Regions:
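Short coil/turn segments at secondary-structure boundaries
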Residues: 154, 178-179, 297-303, 384-388, ...
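Charge-rich, acidic-biased intrinsically disordered regions
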Residues: 154-160, 176-194, 314-329, 421-457, ...
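Activation/maturation switch segments at domain boundaries
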Residues: 2-4, 18-27, 33, 350-352, ...
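A broad, structural surface signal
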Residues: 133-144, 161-169, 173-176, 180, ...
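Extended, helix-rich architectural segments
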Residues: 1-167, 183
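Extended, charged amphipathic alpha-helical segments
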Residues: 254-395
């Protein structure tokens, strides 16, 4: 009996006989026929073509059925991270995807604008603005110092870049809240960034319901603790072995001790996250190999490629493998240097050949791959390859589409990293008495009101600033936007700071003789004691008195 053909619901197909079907048919043809009819009926009853197994195009599709998010993700993370990092280091298109997203989501860093809810706190708008200025001074003093990093290597802006870039490359990254008092510093709050590889199950035990990917869970599935290795497993000089440290997810007050920075959660119960390049790793690697082959062919075409025909036998018999120093004297196929003159042995003749490069199909093929990579990384093709050769409307639409993705990513980054760190800094400042915030530690609603903030990132990409300015002016006249929002979105600045600066510049322009030293200038060297006597610390940041 051959495969049984079916025709049902307007579709036709073929049910292939497996080994068991053939065995049943061999011993009992009638039972085998009935078995095939039942299988055909089941295949015809399938509601979705994509779920059918009788089609040749779907027979070898080995998709996991009934597997959890961790089962589908955790076993592949190690190799996905390694390949993503290798591509980012060596592949121009992968590097462009990571750098373009980082430049537009992080850029030169986010600027915070404290915004307390003065109506809930029952204070005046002027009092709220004064408090916000104090909080901003303390934040800037902390964020602009490299002491905010436990390794004392990066400022907060640089930490932002590191955290976001690591998230894209590794899928997730972790920030541990630390406390270290250092001489000359107002606050002891600092953070430690830990790479994704170092979070793993102690002694590499298998995943279970209570621990997976280095994260320990409670009975509700919420993180209870994180297990960090003290080093990477393959570090050189790792004589003493790897030691794991258990860090509680929350402290006694319910504050998160570890910030898990990752992309959008795509499935329930998802523990760890795949790198951004995961969907396009194969396409990027194949494109890289093809590009290398075409480049080598172009180099060969540009040189004088020769083949030496010897009367002693077949050419291939004289070929030997090249060593690290290049072709040896016994090689029979060589690329000559420009203008080189060479001698032939008796009986040898030279046959030249050309590989026919450049290939006219190279650019269209690379462009098609770039579009595929852009779709897989949520980047328009134009931004990925840094070329805007389409029409004005198409280029503008590409920027608008990219801006939607950047806004989403930026909001996630701010909520996962910037806001929690800002809240830590302000909380310590209040606890030390540097800021006065009644009810902060006793009323959760008042605490939330004191910690309100807005974050401004890189400006929105544009290709026609004049049209955008005209549109903003009309939106402002309609009352559907604000100057604060326009300043933040178009220029990445705080409108209130811009307004104050304009007022000062206008005053100087109206009365040039009254020009004075800018408020932004730091105290001159040697005047630290005088400045502290005036209510400023040694870095020139005002220490607001607390009554």
């Amino acid at each position: 009996m051959s495969d049984l053909k079916i025709n049902g619901r307007g579709r036709s197909g073929q049910v292939p006989m497996n080994l068991l079907d053939r065995a049943v048919t061999w011993f009992h043809p009638q039972a085998g026929l009935e078995r095939m009819r039942k299988r055909a009926a089941l295949a015809a009853a399938s509601g979705y073509v994509g779920a059918r197994s009788d089609r040749t195009s779907l027979q070898r599709w080995a998709a996991s059925v009934g597997a959890s998010a961790d089962t589908d993700t955790l076993p592949d993370l190690e190799i996905l991270r390694a390949r993503s990092r290798d591509l980012e280091r060596n592949d121009p298109m992968a590097h462009s995807a990571i750098s373009t997203k980082t430049a537009n989501v992080i850029g030169s860093g986010h600027v915070v604008r404290p915004e307390v809810d003065f109506s809930r706190l029952r204070i005046s708008a002027d009092e709220a603005e004064a408090w916000e200025g104090q909080a901003l001074d303390i934040w800037n003093n902390w964020a602009e110092s490299r002491d905010c990093d436990v390794t004392r290597a990066q400022t907060f802006v640089e930490l932002e870049d590191l955290v976001y870039r690591s998230r894209l490359l590794s899928g997730d990254v972790f920030v541990i809240r630390r406390y270290k008092e250092r001489p000359g510093r107002l606050l002891g709050t600092c953070v430690q960034v830990v790479e994704a590889d170092r979070l793993s199950n102690p002694n590499w035990v298998s995943d279970s319901d209570r621990m997976a990917g280095g994260i320990e869970f409670d009975q509700d599935g919420a993180p209870a603790a994180y297990h960090f290795a003290d080093r990477h497993a393959v570090d050189r000089g790792n004589i003493g072995g790897v030691v794991w440290r258990r860090v509680p997810a929350f402290d006694d007050t319910g504050r998160r001790m570890v910030l898990h920075i990752h992309g959008p959660r795509k499935r329930p119960d998802m523990t760890r996250y795949a790198p951004m390049l995961a969907p396009v790793i194969e396409a990027l690697k194949q494109r890289s190999r093809y590009s290398e082959a075409e480049l080598m062919a172009a180099v060969v075409s540009a040189c004088f490629a020769i083949g030496m025909a010897s009367p002693d036998g077949d050419l291939s018999e004289g070929l030997i493998q090249q060593n690290k120093e290049g072709a040896t004297a016994d090689s029979q196929i060589v690329l000559t240097d420009p203008g080189q003159i060479f001698d032939l042995l008796p009986g040898e003749e030279v046959k030249s050949f050309a590989p026919g490069r450049p290939n006219p199909q190279f650019a269209p093929f690379i462009d098609a791959i770039a579009r595929e990579v852009g779709a897989g990384t949520d980047l328009p093709h134009e931004m990925l390859v840094k070329q805007f050769q389409a029409s004005y409307s198409a280029s503008r639409a590409a920027l608008e589409m990219a801006w939607q993705f950047f806004k989403t990513d930026r909001a996630l980054h701010v909520s996962q990293f910037c806001e929690p760190v800002y809240e830590d800094v302000i909380t310590e400042a209040i606890a030390r008495g540097l800021l006065k915030a009644p009810g902060f530690f006793t009323d959760p609603l008042r605490k939330q009101a004191w910690l309100g903030s807005t974050w401004m990132g890189p400006s929105r990409p544009t290709i026609d600033p004049v049209k955008d300015a005209n549109a903003d002016e009309k939106y402002l006249a309609m009352g559907v936007t604000t100057r604060t929002r326009i300043a933040a979105e178009r220029f990445g600045v705080d409108y209130r700071a811009v307004r104050r600066r304009i007022e000062r510049e206008s005053a100087v322009a109206d009365n040039p003789q009254s020009s004075s030293v800018s408020e932004d200038v730091s105290p001159r060297p040697g005047a630290a004691d005088q400045e502290r006597g005036k209510g400023r610390n040694r870095r020139g940041v005002k220490l607001w008195p607390v009554s």
